[in-house]
Amino acid sequence: MFDRIEDAIEDIKQGKMIIVVDDENRENEGDLVMAAEKVTGEHINFMIKYGRGLVCVPMTEKRLNELGIYQMVENNTDHKETAFTVSVDYKECTTGISAFERALTVKKLVDDNSKPEDFTKPGHIFPLRAKDGGVLVRAGHTEAAVDLAVLAGLKPAGVICEIIKDDGNMARLPDLLEFAKKFGLRIISIEDLIKYRMKNEILVRRVAQAKLPTKYGNFEIVGYEEILTRKQHVALIKGDINKEPVLVRIHSECLTGDILGSLRCDCGDQLHAAMERIGQEGGVLVYLRQEGRGIGLLNKIKAYHLQDQGLDTVEANIKLGFPPDLREYSIAAQILKDIGVKKIRIMTNNPQKIMELSDYGLDVVERVSIEICPNHYNEKYLKTKKERMGHLILEV
């Protein structure tokens, strides 16, 4: 359905437009996207005529500050946090509204010789302030446009325009696919762009290493930090990991289960079972700081409250506005590669974890079950994971 990110990057490099689609649970829209330094009046005219949305120019915060172009409002209450700045025209424009004068303004925004006094405010081009870190920090069209320009080896700025149908409503995916076919444009998703960056960029660095004696044996503990978010994770290593395949457990943080002994989940029991087995056989345990299946500790407690009222763990997440599972495993894959592990036997009941690790280049040769006997408090939770989340659990 979607084109390859590599092909889209090549089109951006050649000055072509593509269509970028975001998540159906977000804005669920498609934008025409191209590199700002490649724009022409014909491109802007196409966007105005066929896209029909607002023509905007995503740029880095650094560049906007250099040009003295600041945010439109001090208190941004937009629910998607779209970071509009004051609109601008290039000083030599007449009205600034024509496709060709708008293209001129865009070109001057990315011209290294431009100065703050070269732009009048307000104008007819709407710069957008992209977040540092791009789609890995905010999964929006603003960040996607800048990321694509950078990946194409061009200046970090794009031109975007929403695609609106003839009847005035937003074009959704079926409409966008037809639009792409009609005009011969490639179409990609922000989700695929995120995966591409996670797979091809180094996003974690090793910070510290020490010996860690435990009741399950003597481990080596290695501390890692995510480069963009500063989030911290650890890996516990036991024995000779050069003998592949290596036994691996990737465990997501659960304060209530791992530390406080909660009976509502099987997390703590799984953690200790994994440490015991790795202590005996050798291997690696990666401990990821993605509490509550990625929603955080306080939201997890809110989800517990909803479960007390009768909702299951999936329904509780959705009620709070989250997907059933927000976890992702690209960082774990990068940690394992840094350690030197490529071929693994993975201790998990979660087939999604296996799929993601394979997508990120690890050779998963075996799934090792890690089932815990259910108790009165977590039986419904485990049954929900099996029936609604596809976990491979036999005991419930």
From Swiss-Prot:
Keyword Ribosomal protein recorded: no
Keywords: GTP-binding, Hydrolase, Lyase, Magnesium, Manganese, Metal-binding, Multifunctional enzyme, Nucleotide-binding, Riboflavin biosynthesis, Zinc
A GO molecular-function descriptor: zinc ion binding
Site (Essential for DHBP synthase activity): H124, E162
Biochemical pathway: Cofactor biosynthesis; riboflavin biosynthesis; 2-hydroxy-3-oxobutyl phosphate from D-ribulose 5-phosphate: step 1/1; Cofactor biosynthesis; riboflavin biosynthesis; 5-amino-6-(D-ribitylamino)uracil from GTP: step 1/4
Binding site for D-ribulose 5-phosphate: R26, E27, D31, R138, A139, G140, H141, T142, E162
Domain of life from the UniProt record: Bacteria
Note on how the cofactor is bound: Binds 2 divalent metal cations per subunit. Magnesium or manganese.
SUPFAM superfamilies: RibA-like (SSF142695), YrdC/RibB (SSF55821)
Chain residue ranges for the region called DHBP synthase: 1-199
Active site as annotated: D325, R327
UniProt-annotated binding residues for Mg(2+) 1: E27
Reaction(s) the record says it catalyses: D-ribulose 5-phosphate = (2S)-2-hydroxy-3-oxobutyl phosphate + formate + H(+); GTP + 4 H2O = 2,5-diamino-6-hydroxy-4-(5-phosphoribosylamino)-pyrimidine + formate + 2 phosphate + 3 H(+)
Cofactor: Mg(2+); Mn(2+); Zn(2+)
GO biological process, any: riboflavin biosynthetic process
Amino-acid positions noted as binding GTP in the UniProt annotation, renumbered to this chain: R249, I250, H251, S252, E253, Q270, E291, G292, R293, T313, T348, K353
Entry's EC annotation: 4.1.99.12, 3.5.4.25
Membrane-spanning residues: none
Segments for region (GTP cyclohydrolase II): 200-396
GO cellular component terms listed in the entry, alphabetical order: cytosol
Family of the protein in this entry: In the N-terminal section; belongs to the DHBP synthase family. In the C-terminal section; belongs to the GTP cyclohydrolase II family.
PANTHER family per UniProt: 3,4-DIHYDROXY-2-BUTANONE 4-PHOSPHATE SYNTHASE, GTP CYCLOHYDROLASE II-RELATED
Cited NCBIfam families: PRK00393.1 (NF001591), PRK09311.1 (NF006803), ribA (TIGR00505), ribB (TIGR00506)
Function: Catalyzes the conversion of D-ribulose 5-phosphate to formate and 3,4-dihydroxy-2-butanone 4-phosphate. Catalyzes the conversion of GTP to 2,5-diamino-6-ribosylamino-4(3H)-pyrimidinone 5'-phosphate (DARP), formate and pyrophosphate.
Protein name per its UniProtKB record: Riboflavin biosynthesis protein RibBA
Species assigned in the record: Thermoanaerobacter pseudethanolicus (strain ATCC 33223 / 39E) (Clostridium thermohydrosulfuricum)
Gene transcribed to yield this protein: ribBA
